From Swiss-Prot:
Binding residue positions for a divalent metal cation: D598, E638, D670, H808
Modification sites for Phosphoserine: S825
Positions of the UniProt region annotated as Interaction with guide RNA: 530-567, 758-805
Keywords: Acetylation, Cytoplasm, Endonuclease, Hydrolase, Metal-binding, Nuclease, Phosphoprotein, Ribonucleoprotein, RNA-binding, RNA-mediated gene silencing, Translation regulation, Ubl conjugation
UniProt KW ATP-binding keyword: no
Subunit structure: Interacts with EIF4B, IMP8, PRMT5 and TNRC6B. Interacts with APOBEC3F, APOBEC3G and APOBEC3H. Interacts with EDC4.
Gene: AGO3
Subcellular locations according to the entry: Cytoplasm, P-body
Organism: Homo sapiens (Human)
Name this polypeptide is given: Protein argonaute-3
Domain PAZ, chain residue ranges per copy: 230-349
GO cellular component terms, A-Z: condensed nuclear chromosome; cytoplasm; cytoplasmic ribonucleoprotein granule; cytosol; membrane; nucleoplasm; nucleus; P-body
Amino acid sequence: MEIGSAGPAGAQPLLMVPRRPGYGTMGKPIKLLANCFQVEIPKIDVYLYEVDIKPDKCPRRVNREVVDSMVQHFKVTIFGDRRPVYDGKRSLYTANPLPVATTGVDLDVTLPGEGGKDRPFKVSIKFVSRVSWHLLHEVLTGRTLPEPLELDKPISTNPVHAVDVVLRHLPSMKYTPVGRSFFSAPEGYDHPLGGGREVWFGFHQSVRPAMWKMMLNIDVSATAFYKAQPVIQFMCEVLDIHNIDEQPRPLTDSHRVKFTKEIKGLKVEVTHCGTMRRKYRVCNVTRRPASHQTFPLQLENGQTVERTVAQYFREKYTLQLKYPHLPCLQVGQEQKHTYLPLEVCNIVAGQRCIKKLTDNQTSTMIKATARSAPDRQEEISRLVRSANYETDPFVQEFQFKVRDEMAHVTGRVLPAPMLQYGGRNRTVATPSHGVWDMRGKQFHTGVEIKMWAIACFATQRQCREEILKGFTDQLRKISKDAGMPIQGQPCFCKYAQGADSVEPMFRHLKNTYSGLQLIIVILPGKTPVYAEVKRVGDTLLGMATQCVQVKNVIKTSPQTLSNLCLKINVKLGGINNILVPHQRPSVFQQPVIFLGADVTHPPAGDGKKPSIAAVVGSMDAHPSRYCATVRVQRPRQEIIQDLASMVRELLIQFYKSTRFKPTRIIFYRDGVSEGQFRQVLYYELLAIREACISLEKDYQPGITYIVVQKRHHTRLFCADRTERVGRSGNIPAGTTVDTDITHPYEFDFYLCSHAGIQGTSRPSHYHVLWDDNCFTADELQLLTYQLCHTYVRCTRSVSIPAPAYYAHLVAFRARYHLVDKEHDSAEGSHVSGQSNGRDPQALAKAVQIHQDTLRTMYFA
């Protein structure tokens, strides 16, 4: 992949993504199967046509119906026996050219509409170019280099896109497509999630170029859809109403707001017009019930009168509303005042839920979808057999052959690093299957805690004083064993209630106890108090806080207390453990800074909240201590807008902490999808360089830019049962793959660095987009695996390198800093809580960390 010049005069050099420097050899070989299936493609040219459908802006489903109807209708004159494939937008491919003039052809197509009304469309088809699969073979086998991919080159001329469209054509007609997955309504089984939502199962399918061949990646997939049901039932599920007939009163304000939030944007169909099931999109819920909600009705004599919705339905449809006390749905355009009583509407089937699931729904979803690795492997194999690609007429038309057995891959299990602890006996821990423990070990550098406070936001009934006393005694014992002694009793221990009391209490503590190191906050479950504690502690007063759920105070376990100590020690400037120095890769021989970066976006369907960009940087040579920077930026923008100034801040902090200037920058970037690689790399690599040059004009450290991806569907399974690990039968921690299923010539690899506990482990995918430091495959794979062992919050190796994980935590914490107190106290009648309508300066200030907290790992 190459990046076209985009400078003022096109002066920027082409950025060539590095080629693979060779293959890794370290580690113990392991035989694996991957859910990738080889696709054999003929060495032919296919023909690309541009399709233009008017009226445009129709959903892809409708476009597909139009094209399907067109192919049937013009079979004799144009299409003959050809079976074109279509991507649902503007690209149509055929195996043989169509008899159309170079200027194109215009066709009229009609689809049957609702209620006997036909829908007319105008379709124009125009030849664009040939697409060569012969060239694709040459690139896959390494015989020719691909031409530079310019930023503005259309995807439709890409031969890989053509392969993808062929394989997706039939499933797109049969199922409900969502992204790269296909779903169908549950038949004979039911997986309700509550709140009017349910689980639909389906499969993911995507085509990827691999070494010497094209691979089809197939995986089982599940997502939440809205249940097709009467709107009244939907409302009852959302509001936890067990029997609507026992609710003769109108909805309360807070109920109406909650219901509006859930149903807004959904499609409903009406039931009061016989077979004419007209569909509408909901834009609001009325404040007034159907018995009082009025609208201007035009009579036959031209006069306009006010009618209530209930009256209108009685007069027009002789329908006496059963629930006139309930509100109406406002549908279509806001200004048009179209109202429908809830009882004549059903939720339209097949609508995917894009809104965020609640915690309960998420946990139900995980339980319904988690499969042990062997079960998932079996399910995927079943899927591929039932997909029966050899009978797919479109796959046949283009002469594809899809193998129905998983790809055999040889991976390697990398050696785990040893971890150095402190104390008198300076013990070393050796992880086994990605896990180790603290028993008999002390922190590498433990903090002594002399002055600390407790604020209990659980009630005295929930958490009596003797329970608190027991908890502090246990915590002090475990902290002493861990080498982080908490001395004496807390200087302050009080009960408090509600988020409003956080700030005054913390101010009192700050003013009264100089040298206060830590406030332990006890929370009564999920509460707005948490966000307020973090806002006041992190941004307003600069005080270290550690929250604990009351259930863990009432019933203490050594494991929970030990995990608390891991977090507390780091927040107060301690070091839990370090990588044993002699086993680290050679990149550590000179000063090096590790950066992790992530952007988190607001939940789908929320256009007002900003996206949050976070970048963290290591501050020592181990690397164990990190410093954070965070910014708010335009919603849904993936590029980190202010990266240059964030990296500059971190380089300055690194210099202050170590008195060295890094000669190398290793940048792990989370959350970028393949389609965005080029734009993001182009902007961000230049921003990192700009940060360096702004400090000293000749300062040019070597930069390595690595994208970390977890949101992909490649899964690896042990070919030999005896190699499976744990109850879920997963691949061992440290399993690495950089052959067969990886990119034909770019530098990428899969690494599963964690031990799978539930379900099937998902290996992380690493793609090196820039490398001034000329890493070998072994060096970078080992470095990445070692960094997965340096995450301070647990004694396990995690699934992505610590810096990338910390960036995610920092961005997540900033979401809490943005919560408005006044909005979040309860579900009031105003729009719920975050950062709505606040100006950019106020948002930027809200996520700004207090000077005293800035250099600590407050996010741990």
